[in-house]
């Protein structure tokens, strides 16, 4: 299954965010193959636990968006690109609404 990211508020998962491709979504995924391990240019994504949970808060979102934008330049059209776009949308929402992103590994 890989890593899935959910948006949480007060410990509850939020659903039905606007999808960049139209419609709505409630989680982001399909991009874990692109997550660089041990790369100092990706300090937040590099710390995501592929087997457990990693929580990031609103103060992390500016840096996370920068890292996602770098990965978007590497991603090919398809599921990985869509997953990164959804993650970016979630990070933008988290930064303004004071939520939390939860990365859930296998």
Role assignments for model-derived ranges:
Residues 1-106:
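Acidic (Asp/Glu-rich) sequence patches and key acidic residues
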């Amino acid at each position: 299954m890989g890593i899935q990211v959910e948006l949480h508020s007060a410990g509850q998962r939020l659903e039905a965010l606007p999808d960049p491709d139209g419609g709505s979504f409630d989680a982001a995924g399909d991009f874990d193959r692109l997550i660089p391990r041990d790369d100092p240019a990706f300090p937040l994504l590099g710390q995501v636990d592929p087997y457990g949970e990693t929580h990031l808060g609103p103060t992390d979102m500016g840096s996370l968006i920068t890292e996602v934008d770098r990965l978007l330049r590497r991603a090919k059209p398809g599921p990985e690109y869509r997953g990164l776009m959804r993650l970016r949308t979630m990070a933008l929402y988290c930064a303004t609404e004071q939520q939390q992103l939860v990365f859930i590994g296998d």
